[in-house]
Structures are given as structure tokens and as C-alpha cells.
Amino acid sequence: MGVWKSMVWGVLLWHSQSGAICPVWPSARTIEEIARLQQQLADWNDIYWKQGVSAVDDSVYDQLSAKLVQWQRCVGQDVSSTPVSPPLNGTTTHPVAHTGVRKLADRQAVAQWMRGHSEFWVQPKVDGVAVTLVYQNGKLTRAISRGNGLQGEDWTQKIRQISSIPQTTRGALANAVLQGEIFLQLKGHIQQRMGGMNARSKVAGMLMRQKNTSALNSLGIFIWAWPDGPANMTERLSQLAKAGFSLTQKYSQMVKNASEVERARRSWLTSALPFVTDGVVIRMAKEPSSQYWRPGQGDWLAAWKYPPVAQVAQVSAIQFSVGKSGKISVIASLVPVMLDDKRVKRVNIGSVKRWEAWDIAPGDQILVSLAGQGIPRLDEVVWRSRERSKPVPPGNHFNSLTCFYASATCQEQFISRLVWLGSRAALGLDGMGEASWRALHQTHRFEHIFSWLALTPAEIANTPGFAKGKSELIWRQFNLARRQPFSRWVMAMDIPLTQAALQASGDRSWEQLLMRTDQHWRQLPATGERRAGRVSDWRDNPRIKALSRWLAAQHIPGFGT
């Protein structure tokens, strides 16, 4: 399907600065867009932490937060005020600070981080809400939300209502500080197939609401740190399991290299687990004394996250395509993003009406995922740019009987017709994709959709971008097409019949086809009164008649007298 190049609007240019992809906007607009996105994130953040309600999917929030930091770095702004963490309104001090975890981008980064050390453990990165549990004299005395890592909210009363969290401990755990993740308990959750399910927001909502405390029993705990616990990790896991924190032992594996980390990561991504995860955490077996723990300084652990199921992508331009039937489709060109191993640069929005309903303009941020067969799909608009400059779509004068002949306004539908006639459903011209048809048409200025039949081997060879081997292949394909049966040529002319109906009709010549009545067409498979009328309109169209005469002059089977 061709693209309406002349109607592209608002193409955004991009450049790289310090590894970031930066929008090339006037400085005033850049600062304004940063401020607007920062305010939007702050509003979502406030609702999330104060009301326990998520106004946006967790993954979308995380990706937009990262994009804000990226933009701020592009213009040299301080990123410390970026609202990617909860408000600092907790007043209960953590006995041991939460360090957070550094993010590693890929297997190579994991291998580099592990270099020089020999013993590591890998665990699922459980997606929930972080908490500190304080046990004194064998009893749970305090539970503190992560907050800013140094101080958080007192969640003791809520945590005591979660039946899966032990209220008493013995032995080394009788007086201990534990850090972990409160998560939504699930049965048979397969991360790759089911995604994040907004689990983090659901957990936060349950912990912050004053009512419906019975729902807290659907929560569980995964302990990922025991500051100043047993030096031997195996012993540490064993004691946690005996105390009722069994998940930590079950989902912790000793690893020696990045390959083993990758194997565990893949296994947990595709296996049934009791919680949502968003990657893995690799921990060095030896960690410093808790007195040295500080937010942002946990150098002995790192995370390797899963690629998101959906990516936030920036719209760089809006384009229009016209199919062979005259249908206009809208396409969003994107600043490229990776989904699985696919580089996504564009997504089909659909009809002009659907595009107008979505209200998408260059500069907007949209959520894109992969549908069946790896086709990019638009899921939602997650943030709109202040500037709403949109292109004007082409007129609606295109239909199934237009653009068999080339003209300035017919450029895209004409190319779409060429692509169609070269497909296996019509003449089966191997090696003839849209780019090849464009090159031939731009060089040799076709009059109509069959003008290529008149090209000589020398003319094909002189087409820019055509190597000798390709030129010879195309020449052979064009010659072979002359031997195709009449029905194939009629399909190439876009007769409004299915192949099955055309075969059932039994027509072997243009003369036979001209003699058919609407009653005959109506009797064919999948051909009602409306389609029969379309066939007659197609057959009687002056452009179609002219093409049939031209094919007769070329001695195409079924068109001669």
C-alpha cells in the first residue's frame, strides 16, 4: 500500500546527545513540553500514592518517567525533581535504608557487571510495593513503606492484616530487619503471556484504602534482603523458609555467569509463577554491613528487566495511504522503538474517521504493542503534545474504479494497484514489491497499470537501483506474465469477484465476460445483488474497456478477437 508522501506533516527531526534521542524543537517548546509532562507525571504520582488509585498503567508511567529524564538531559536540566518516586511525606525512619537497584540494559551489561566476582544469586524481580518489616523479641513491631528509602509511611496495622506475613519469628529472625516486596498473589501467572496486570497499582490501592481490609489477604510477601543476616546465602534462605518466608528460597538460584542469569530470566518469564515480575535481580553473595546502605548506592545488586509488552513511542509524522480500492488509511510514523526483536517505525491507525477520533498529532506519545504475526498495533494515546498541527487528509474522491491510469492525484492508489497485480492473487510477479514498482514508474512514467508490458530489457536495466541480476529477473517475470490465463489478468484488473466466483463463471475471454448479465453474476458463489451490480459497473467503465483493448494489442490470452 503506497504512502501519500506529499501529505506528510510535521516531521520531527531527532539527534543524539549523550546517548539519548533528543527532539529538535525550539527551546521554548522543549521547555514547555518538559514542564507539561512533568506536571502530568506529578499528578498521576499524587493520585497513586495518596489515593491508591492508578490513573495510568504502571509500565506507561515508568516509560514516560524515563522519557522525561531523557528530555531533561537533552537540554541540561536538573533531573532530581522528576516525580518518579513517591512523595517524601513519610515520617517513620527505616532502621536500614532501601538502596534501590541499578538497571542493566542487556546480557553484555550483566556480564560486565559480574566480571571480577565469582558467587551470585538471581531472583525474580517481583512487581509490587517495597516494605520494611521489623521484628523485635519475636514479634512484628513495625512495617514501613519504602518512601524515599530513608523514611516511609507506617503500615504496621495494614501489614498485620495480611495473613501470609508471619507475625512472629524465632531464632536469628526474632530480632531482625527484613526488606521485601508486597505482591498480589496469583495462580499460574505467566509473565510473557499475561503481562503486568497493573499489579503494583492494585497492591498500593489495597494498602492505602481505609476500608475493605479483607482484600489484604490476597497479598503476599517476597523477602529480598535480610540486612546483617547470615553471611552464607544458603543458610540465610533456609532460615527465612523455616520462618514462613518460603518463596525466597524457592525462587533464588546460585549463578556464576551471565548465561546462567539469562537462562533463569527466560525460565521465569515463560513459567507459571505466583506473582507478577518485571525482570530479575542479580545479587552478589557478599554484601556490606547495613550501616553502609544508602538510597541509590546498592552496588552489590542489579536488575535486568524484561522488555515491556507494549512500548511508548513518539509520533514523528502522520501519513496517508490509498489502497487499490480507494480506501484511505492513516499511518503514524514513529521514533523507532524495539518490541521483542522487532524495530517498530510505523503503526497503522486505520481510517481517517478513526484517526480523528484518536486525535493523534506529531509529538504525541502512543502505546504500541505487537498483534498477531508481529504486526504493530496502536493501543492508546498516553500523552498529547501541546501543539496540535495535523495534516489534511486527501479528498474522498477515490473508489474502486479510480486510478487505473496514472495522474498526479492518483499516485498512491496507482502504486497500490501495481502492487496488487504483482501479488500472488493476481499475476504473481516474484520480486516486484512496492519499492520496485515505484522505481519503475518514476523512471518510465507509466500511462496505466499495464504499461510495464511495453518495457524493453534495456529500459528495465537502466532503472536506478536495479542491479543486473534483478533487471534480468524482472524481465523474465514480465515475459512469463504474458502466459498467465485470462482469469489472472482479470483479477489484475481488480474485477470485484472472488477467485472462486470467477472460476465458477467459467469465462475464458473478454468477449464472454461482456455477454454476462447481472443475473449470471448473482448466481456465483459469494455474489449477491450488490456485488453483481459492481461487476457490471466495472465491466462498463471506459478505463477498463480501454485497458482490455490495450491488452488485446499486446496479444494477452483471452483479450484478442
From Swiss-Prot:
Catalytic activity field: NAD(+) + (deoxyribonucleotide)n-3'-hydroxyl + 5'-phospho-(deoxyribonucleotide)m = (deoxyribonucleotide)n+m + AMP + beta-nicotinamide D-nucleotide
Keyword Hydrolase: no
Residue spans crossing the bilayer: none
EC number(s) per entry: 6.5.1.2
Active-site residues (renumbered): K125 (n6-amp-lysine intermediate)
BP GO terms, sorted: DNA repair; DNA replication
GO molecular-function terms, A-Z: DNA ligase (NAD+) activity
InterPro entries found in the cross-reference section: DNA_ligase_AS, DNA_ligase_B, DNAligase_adenylation, DNAligase_N, NA-bd_OB-fold, NAD_dep_DNA_ligaseB, NAD_DNA_ligase_OB, RuvA_2-like
Class of this enzyme: ligase
PROSITE patterns hit by this protein: DNA_LIGASE_N1
Keyword hit for NAD: yes
Function as written in the Swiss-Prot or TrEMBL entry: Catalyzes the formation of phosphodiester linkages between 5'-phosphoryl and 3'-hydroxyl groups in double-stranded DNA using NAD as a coenzyme and as the energy source for the reaction.
Protein family membership: Belongs to the NAD-dependent DNA ligase family. LigB subfamily.
Listed name of the protein: DNA ligase B
Organism in which the protein naturally occurs: Salmonella arizonae (strain ATCC BAA-731 / CDC346-86 / RSK2980)
